Amino acid sequence: MLLTFLGTSSGTPTRSRNVTSIALQLPQRSSLWLFDCGEGTQHQVLRTPLRLSQLEKVFFTHLHGDHLFGLVGLLASRALGSAGTTPVKLYGPPGLQEYVRATLRYSDTHINYPIHFQTVEPGLVLSEEGFTVLANALKHRISAFGYSVIEHDQPGRFDAERAAQLGIPFGPLYGQLKAGRTVALPDGRTVDGRTLVGPERKGRKLTYCSDTIYTPSAIELALGADVLIHEATYCEADLNLAERGLHSTAAMAARVAREAKVRQLILTHFSPRYEAGLAALRTEAEAIFPNVRMAEDFWRYEIKAVEAQLPKALVEQ
């Protein structure tokens, strides 16, 4: 699971940060998912290896402009590219479909591929081969949702090298061993396939929460996540601004990470008032939760799977 941060500023762009958008590339799939699509996102994509022709889904946390205004231009550019008639599905709060249809109509923009819409509610958003997406309501000035992308658990890895060392002939026997069965070899030995297949690999979990002030629903959504991406618009010194706008401080985001027992916290959605530096935000977050990274535009982050150890192979003579 590979993340590319396309925009990490809140409200307005700065010289070094565009407004919010995050790209997600999933393993063994050529599709691209976006989370939010602020103004200028398509320009950001042009400066990365990403391709709009691979865009499959866009998930919107809420409908404020710094998360939305880049969508229609991006869809229009995709229609002029090599995507053909491959559809795009848009997920978001009520009003998303009305906004997109009206903007396309009044700008006389024609899209040559299907656009599908799904209004998001707390709970299951989708479940398809390999992945499930869940949503939960956040606490912001308008309807807002956080998302969790959960990879389904994977079968354990088959150790073909060890099988070869044991003199097991390559062929149909490998399929039986991969399935964890005990097989008889031509020389009379038996091999327990379970000892050549690692433990089931737990799927990875990514949670994204923005925009929101501290809320228990974010903790519920992020519980046990490998990576939590959480907005950190302000530092605690500007708590009054966070409370007024229903945004999070870096300390609030760190509390969510700690209470949800996540592995890694990535902060994003920084107010332009901190353009000179984010040291204060990082310091206050690390005082609560040590594994903190500060997102930057075009930064790529891989969520790596945790590999389990194989047991010792059991071979009976």
Curated annotation (Swiss-Prot):
GO terms for molecular function: 3'-tRNA processing endoribonuclease activity; zinc ion binding. Zn(2+) 2 binds at residues 66-67, 211, 269. It comes from the Bacteria. The active site is at residue 66. Keywords: Endonuclease, Hydrolase, Metal-binding, Nuclease, tRNA processing, Zinc. Binds 2 Zn(2+) ions. It holds the Pfam family Lactamase_B_2. Zn(2+) 1 binds at residues 62, 64, 140, 211. Its EC number is 3.1.26.11. It catalyses: Endonucleolytic cleavage of RNA, removing extra 3' nucleotides from tRNA precursor, generating 3' termini of tRNAs. A 3'-hydroxy group is left at the tRNA terminus and a 5'-phosphoryl group is left at the trailer molecule. SUPFAM superfamilies: Metallo-hydrolase/oxidoreductase. It is an enzyme of class 3 (hydrolase). Its cofactor is Zn(2+). Homodimer. Zinc phosphodiesterase, which displays some tRNA 3'-processing endonuclease activity. Probably involved in tRNA maturation, by removing a 3'-trailer from precursor tRNA. This is Ribonuclease Z. It comes from Gloeobacter violaceus (strain ATCC 29082 / PCC 7421).
